[in-house]
Every structure is written in structure tokens, then in C-alpha cells.
């Protein structure tokens, strides 16, 4: 029996997820500096027409409950001077085969010189677009655009499982010598989503607080070793 296509639950448009620019900088004097490259699960701007009236990771109940802030809460226990930046790259997801064009508006993020780059995206790339290019190769180029040869990397697969894209994310992680974190099972679990909290079905299909915490917990299982490698360089 074929598995349900959970990705179809994501009816939140990939376009116009932000009102401002796609780069949200961190402190330049922070150590370690952690860059999250993501999509609406990482950060979605206010969009009242779908009942999303806040600006943080969809669909957490508060900013401090999204996976970025839960991850950083864990990191800062060991590294009080740590800080993070975010690049919201829903644009790249829909244009991954076009090279650096979607990345250039966020070049400031690589100038921040992150110690660690976390790649946590892919859900907005329609499977039918995979024929347009080598997705795994494009993911490697995306990561290295921001981190170059100096950063260490962590890659997750997708919240809503997709075999082809999840395999590409896994292969990209291998090429980058990155830590790989599986979260694709979470998108199959109703309790990990925000059902009943939002009228818009696409928003509600995003991870709720429990899902966000679980994503953060899984990242934090591997992130300390990644940070240690980065700071040892």
C-alpha cells in the first residue's frame, strides 16, 4: 500500500512568505554563530488572510516555542555567547536549479561567517520540479554559498516525507560531511502538528509546539559535536 502524500497538507503558498527581506542577522560578536537556512517552518511573516498574524516558525504558539528558538535555548546552556541568524529561502526551493540567483540577495549571511550552517528546508520544492536539476548537488551549493569551507554543517530531511527529496538531502549531507537529522517521521504524526489551533488547514498541518520541540531535540542530539568541530578549526 502506498503511503499518504503528506506534503499535500502543506497548502500554505510558498510565495510571499515574508513582508521584509529574507535575511535576519545575528550578533557579529557571537560565538558560536549558527545560521538556519529554512522556510516557513523556520520563519513565516504575518499573513492575516490565512490566519497567521505573527512572525516566527509556523505553527508554533509563540516565538520562543519554534524549533529555532528551542534549539538555541539548548545551545546557549553550553555557549551563553551563541547567537543565530536566519535565511528564509522559500524562493530557492522553487528555483533550486537556477544557481546562485536566489541566494545573492542574502550574501550578507555568508559575510556573517557562521560557524555552523543548518539546512532545514525542501518542503516547498514540488516533486515535479526535480527534473530541472540535480537536487542534491543544488543543496550542497546552497549550503556552501553560506558556509564555504570554514563552516560545519547539519542537514535535516523534510517534515512531510518525500522519498526522492529526503534521499537528496541525505546525499547532500554525505557530500558536506554534515550531521544528518531525520524528522520525516514527524509529518506522519497528527500530534506533532497544530491541528485544531488554526482554521487554515495548511497552517495547522505545520508543526505545533510538540513538533517544534521534537525537531529541536533531534537537532540538539547532534549539534554539540558539530559546534565542537567548527570551533576547533
Provide a role label for each language-model segment.
Residues 6-35, 43-130:
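Conserved SGNH/GDSL esterase-like catalytic core that processes O-acyl groups on lipids
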Residues 159-233:
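Catalytic His-Asp segment of secreted/periplasmic serine-dependent ester chemistry enzymes
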Residues 118-127, 143-171, 175:
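Active-site segments of SGNH/GDSL-like serine hydrolases
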Amino acid at each position: 500500500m502506498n503511503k499518504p502524500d503528506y506534503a499535500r497538507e502543506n497548502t500554505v503558498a510558498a510565495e510571499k512568505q515574508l513582508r521584509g527581506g529574507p535575511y535576519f542577522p545575528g550578533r557579529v560578536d557571537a560565538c558560536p554563530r549558527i545560521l538556519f537556512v529554512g522556510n516557513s517552518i523556520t520563519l513565516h511573516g504575518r499573513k492575516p488572510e490565512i490566519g497567521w498574524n505573527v512572525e516566527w516558525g509556523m505553527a508554533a504558539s509563540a516565538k520562543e516555542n519554534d524549533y529555532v528558538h528551542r534549539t538555541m535555548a539548548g545551545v546557549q546552556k553550553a555557549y551563553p555567547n551563541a547567537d543565530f541568524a536566519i535565511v528564509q529561502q522559500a524562493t530557492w526551493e522553487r528555483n533550486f536549479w537556477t544557481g546562485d540567483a536566489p541566494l545573492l540577495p542574502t550574501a550578507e549571511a555568508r559575510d556573517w561567517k557562521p560557524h555552523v550552517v543548518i539546512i532545514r528546508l525542501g518542503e516547498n520544492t514540488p516533486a515535479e520540479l526535480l527534473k530541472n536539476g540535480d537536487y542534491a548537488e543544488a543543496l550542497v551549493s546552497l549550503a556552501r554559498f553560506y558556509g564555504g569551507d570554514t563552516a560545519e554543517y547539519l542537514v535535516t530531511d523534510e517534515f512531510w516525507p518525500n522519498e526522492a527529496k529526503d534521499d537528496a538531502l541525505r546525499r547532500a549531507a554525505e557530500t558536506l560531511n554534515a550531521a544528518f537529522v531525520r524528522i520525516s517521521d514527524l509529518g506522519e504524526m497528527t500530534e506533532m502538528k497544530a491541528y485544531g489551533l488554526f482554521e487554515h488547514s495548511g497552517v495547522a498541518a505545520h508543526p505545533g509546539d510538540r513538533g517544534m520541540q521534537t525537531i529541536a531535540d533531534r537537532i540538539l542530539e547532534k549539534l554539540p559535536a558539530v559546534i565542537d568541530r567548527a570551533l576547533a578549526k
